[in-house]
C-alpha cells in the first residue's frame, strides 16, 4: 500500500507542476497527450484506492491558478473544466449517462475546442463591465483593460438588455499568421512562444495593454451563462444570441440529434482541422436543452452535461541522423535534430528543436536513436523522447559542444543560464552576418533586396564586415555589377534606394536593429519616445532607463553595457556620419498637411497591397483622422478597399461584392502626401 500511495503522490506532484507551467507560466514542459495519460493513470489509481484520494488532488480540483499580477475576482458561477473523452466508447458512455437521467436532451451541440485561454465577460447596462480569466475556477484575474483591446469582443450589446447583467464565456486565442508575425518581431534574446496557445495566454496576462493590442489576439465566444434569465431554452439558441449581439462565434458549431451524429462530426472536424487559421485540439459536446443542466448536475471539477473529445496526439518515430549546432546574432548556441524525413500532420519533417544541451541530457538523446516527434500545439516539431527498445548497443551519450561552430571560440554559460554562448561578438563570422541580417530585416531598418545569400556573398568579398558598411556599398557599384554576384544594375539601384530610405527610419527602428539583448521592438519604441534622441539615450543612467514603462533591470543594464562598448559607440558615430536618423519621429506627422475627405469618415476600410508608407501608418491615419474601422477581410459591410501595388485576393473579392476601390495614387493625392 505504501508503494501505491507513493505512486499517487508522485503523479499528483507531476500534474500540479504541469498545471503551474501551463496556466501560470504559459510554458508547458510536456505535450498534452503526456498530461492526459498521467491524469488517467491517477484517476484509475484513485478509483481503485479511494482511501488515498484527497480534496486537493488534480483529479478533483479545476486546473489553473490566479496570478498575483492582477486583481483577484471571484466568479459568480464557478468556471469549471470539462471531462475528456478519448474514443467513441467514452462518448457513448457520456450519452448513456445522459439518457439514464430520463430527460429530454433536445440533441447535442458540437463545437470546436479552441486552444487558448478561457475568459468570462460581464456586461452591465449593456456595456462591457469586467473580464475575468478562469483562474482556479473559483477566482480569476481581472484582465478587463486587456480584453478591451481585442476587436472581436464588442464593448456594447443591444440596449434592450441594459436591465440585465449578462455573462458570456469564450476562448481568447491567437491566429497562426498573427502568431508567426509576433514571434518574428520578438527579440532573439526574448523567449519565443512555442505555440499560439502559449502566446495568447502570455499576451493576455501582460501588464502592458499596448502589447496586447499590438499582438492581435482574437476571441470566440461559446456560452451565455444566464441564458435562461433571458427566456432562452436551448444552448443552440444562445449561440444565435451571441451572433446577434456581434460576438464572434465559430461557423463550425452544429446541432445534431444523436451521439452517432456527434461521432460522425469528429471525422468532419478532423478533415478541416489543418485548414483552419487557428488551433483546435478537439471538439466540445454539450446537451442542447439548458433546462436540464442543473438536473444532470456537476462534479467539483466538471459539468456532467458537457464533455471534450480530445484529438489523439500524432506522434511519429524517426531516426536521429545528426545534431546540428548553430550560433545566432547574440551568440546563443542552438541544438537542432536532423532526422530521417517523415510525414507528420500533412507535412514532411526533417528537423526538430532540441532547445539546448540540458534538454538533450535530460532525455538522454543519442545519435542514431529512434526518437519520437510531435508538433507542439500543431506548429513546431518537437522531440518527445527516445524509443530505448531500438537503441543500438554501441550508442554513446551525446556530449555538448565546447567551441563555437563558426569561430571555434570557447563557449560559456553566463549567470547559470541554460544556453551556451559565444562571446566573440565582434570576431565571429556567423554572429556578424546574423547581426546584419537582423539589421536589414522588415521589422528593423527594412532594407529590401538585401537577402541572406547576398549578405553572405558581400561578407566573403569583404564588402560588408559590419552594419555601417551597408551605407558604403554605392562606391563598390562597378565591382558588384561586374563580379559574380549576379546582380543587375536595376536591382542594385533598387537596393541602394532602399538603403538610403532606411536612413529616414525613426530612432526606435535603429535601436531595435542594433539587436541589444532584452530590447525588442516594443521596448525600443517606448525608450525612443521617452529620450527622443540617440545622444540623450546614450547618456541615460540606470534609474532613468528603469523609469521607462516595461524597461526592467536586465534591459537597462544591457543598454548601459552596450553603449559603454567602444565598438558600439564607433558604430553609432559611423551611422550618424552617413546620415542615418538618430531621433524619434512621432507617428502622427501628418497634422499640418493632411486633407480630411468627409466621405471617408466613419467608414469601414480594408487595406491590400504595398504602399510607400507602412500599413500601420495608413491604419493610424484612417483611425485617427477619419474615425474609420480597419478590417482584415472584405465583406458586404466594407465601404472602401484601399489598393496598393501587388494587391491580392482582397481586390478580387471587392470587385465581386461591388465594394468601392481607392487606388493608391488617388489616396495619396486626396490626402496630400
From Swiss-Prot:
Residues 595-673 form the BRCT domain. The active site is at residue 113. Keywords: DNA damage, DNA repair, DNA replication, Ligase, Magnesium, Manganese, Metal-binding, NAD, Zinc. Its cofactor is Mg(2+); Mn(2+). Zn(2+) binds at residues 404, 407, 422, 428. Its EC number is 6.5.1.2. It catalyses: NAD(+) + (deoxyribonucleotide)n-3'-hydroxyl + 5'-phospho-(deoxyribonucleotide)m = (deoxyribonucleotide)n+m + AMP + beta-nicotinamide D-nucleotide. SUPFAM superfamilies: BRCT domain, DNA ligase/mRNA capping enzyme, catalytic domain, Nucleic acid-binding proteins, RuvA domain 2-like. Gene3D superfamilies: 5' to 3' exonuclease, C-terminal subdomain, 6.20.10.30, BRCT domain, DNA ligase/mRNA capping enzyme, Helix hairpin bin, Nucleic acid-binding proteins. One of its GO terms (cellular component) is cytosol. NAD(+) binds at residues 32-36, 81-82, 111, 134, 171, 286, 310. InterPro entries: BRCT_dom, BRCT_dom_sf, DisA/LigA_HHH, DNA_ligase, DNAligase_adenylation, DNAligase_N, NA-bd_OB-fold, NAD_DNA_ligase_OB. One of its GO terms (molecular function) is metal ion binding. GO terms for biological process: DNA repair; DNA replication. It comes from the Bacteria. DNA ligase that catalyzes the formation of phosphodiester linkages between 5'-phosphoryl and 3'-hydroxyl groups in double-stranded DNA using NAD as a coenzyme and as the energy source for the reaction. It is essential for DNA replication and repair of damaged DNA. HAMAP family: DNA_ligase_A. Belongs to the NAD-dependent DNA ligase family. LigA subfamily. This is DNA ligase.
Amino acid at each position: 500500500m505504501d508503494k501505491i500511495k507513493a505512486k499517487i503522490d508522485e503523479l499528483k506532484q507531476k500534474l500540479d507542476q504541469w498545471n503551474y507551467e501551463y496556466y501560470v507560466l504559459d510554458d508547458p514542459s510536456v505535450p498534452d497527450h503526456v498530461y492526459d495519460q498521467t491524469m488517467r493513470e491517477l484517476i484509475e489509481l484513485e478509483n481503485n484506492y479511494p482511501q488515498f484520494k484527497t480534496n486537493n488532488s488534480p483529479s478533483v480540483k479545476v486546473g489553473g491558478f490566479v496570478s498575483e499580477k492582477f486583481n483577484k475576482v471571484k466568479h459568480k458561477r464557478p468556471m469549471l473544466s470539462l471531462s475528456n473523452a478519448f474514443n467513441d466508447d467514452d462518448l457513448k458512455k457520456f450519452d448513456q449517462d445522459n439518457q439514464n437521467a430520463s430527460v429530454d436532451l433536445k440533441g447535442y451541440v458540437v463545437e470546436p475546442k479552441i486552444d487558448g485561454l478561457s475568459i468570462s465577460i460581464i456586461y452591465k447596462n449593456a456595456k462591457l463591465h469586467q473580464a475575468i480569466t478562469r483562474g482556479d475556477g473559483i477566482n480569476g484575474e481581472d484582465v478587463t483593460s486587456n480584453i478591451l483591446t481585442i476587436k472581436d469582443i464588442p464593448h456594447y450589446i443591444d440596449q434592450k438588455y441594459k436591465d440585465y447583467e449578462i455573462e458570456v464565456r469564450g476562448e481568447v486565442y491567437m491566429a497562426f499568421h498573427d502568431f508567426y508575425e509576433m514571434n518574428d518581431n520578438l527579440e532573439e534574446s526574448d523567449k519565443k512562444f512555442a505555440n499560439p496557445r502559449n502566446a495568447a495566454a502570455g499576451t493576455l496576462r501582460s501588464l502592458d495593454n499596448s502589447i496586447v493590442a499590438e499582438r492581435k489576439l482574437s476571441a470566440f465566444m461559446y456560452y451565455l451563462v444566464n441564458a435562461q434569465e433571458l427566456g432562452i431554452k436551448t444552448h443552440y439558441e444562445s449561440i444565435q444570441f451571441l451572433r446577434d449581439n456581434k460576438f464572434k462565434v465559430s461557423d463550425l458549431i452544429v446541432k445534431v440529434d444523436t451521439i452517432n451524429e456527434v461521432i460522425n462530426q469528429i471525422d468532419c472536424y478532423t478533415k478541416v482541422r489543418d485548414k483552419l487559421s487557428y488551433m483546435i485540439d478537439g471538439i466540445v459536446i454539450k446537451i442542447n436543452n439548458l433546462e436540464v443542466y442543473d438536473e444532470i448536475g456537476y462534479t467539483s471539477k466538471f459539468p456532467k452535461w458537457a464533455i471534450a473529445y480530445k484529438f489523439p496526439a500524432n506522434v511519429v518515430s524517426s531516426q536521429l541522423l545528426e545534431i546540428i549546432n548553430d550560433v545566432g546574432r547574440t551568440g546563443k548556441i542552438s541544438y537542432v535534430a536532423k532526422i530521417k524525413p517523415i510525414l507528420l500532420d500533412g507535412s514532411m519533417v526533417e528537423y526538430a528543436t532540441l532547445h539546448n544541451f540540458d534538454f538533450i541530457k535530460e532525455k538522454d538523446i543519442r545519435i542514431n536513436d529512434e526518437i519520437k516527434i510531435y508538433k507542439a500545439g500543431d506548429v513546431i516539431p518537437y522531440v518527445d523522447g527516445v524509443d530505448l527498445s531500438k537503441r543500438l548497443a554501441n550508442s554513446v551519450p551525446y556530449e555538448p559542444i565546447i567551441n563555437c561552430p563558426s569561430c571555434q571560440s570557447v563557449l560559456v554559460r553566463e549567470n547559470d543560464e541554460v544556453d551556451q554562448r559565444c562571446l566573440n561578438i565582434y570576431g565571429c563570422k556567423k554572429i556578424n552576418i546574423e547581426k546584419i541580417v537582423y539589421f536589414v530585416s522588415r521589422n528593423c531598418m527594412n532594407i529590401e533586396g538585401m537577402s541572406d545569400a547576398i549578405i553572405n556573398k558581400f561578407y566573403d568579398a569583404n564588402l560588408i564586415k559590419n552594419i555601417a558598411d551597408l551605407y558604403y556599398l554605392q562606391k563598390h557599384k562597378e565591382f558588384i555589377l561586374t563580379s559574380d554576384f549576379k546582380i543587375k544594375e536595376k536591382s542594385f539601384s533598387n537596393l541602394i534606394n532602399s538603403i538610403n530610405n532606411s536612413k529616414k527610419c525613426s530612432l526606435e527602428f535603429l535601436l531595435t536593429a542594433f539587436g541589444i539583448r532584452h530590447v525588442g521592438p516594443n521596448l525600443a519604441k517606448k525608450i525612443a519616445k521617452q529620450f527622443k534622441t540617440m545622444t540623450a539615450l546614450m547618456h541615460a543612467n540606470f534609474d532613468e532607463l528603469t523609469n521607462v514603462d516595461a524597461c526592467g533591470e536586465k534591459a537597462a543594464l544591457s543598454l548601459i553595457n552596450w553603449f559603454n562598448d567602444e565598438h558600439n559607440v564607433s558604430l553609432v558615430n559611423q551611422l550618424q556620419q552617413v546620415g542615418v536618423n538618430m531621433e524619434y519621429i512621432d507617428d502622427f506627422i501628418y497634422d499640418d498637411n493632411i486633407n480630411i475627405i468627409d466621405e471617408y469618415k466613419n467608414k469601414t476600410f480594408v487595406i491590400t497591397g504595398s504602399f510607400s508608407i507602412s500599413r500601420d501608418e495608413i491604419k493610424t491615419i484612417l483611425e485617427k483622422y477619419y474615425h474609420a474601422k480597419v478590417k482584415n477581410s472584405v465583406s458586404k459591410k466594407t465601404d472602401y478597399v484601399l489598393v496598393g501595388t501587388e494587391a491580392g485576393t482582397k481586390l478580387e473579392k471587392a470587385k465581386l461584392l461591388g465594394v468601392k476601390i481607392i487606388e493608391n495614387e488617388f489616396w495619396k493625392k486626396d490626402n496630400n502626401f
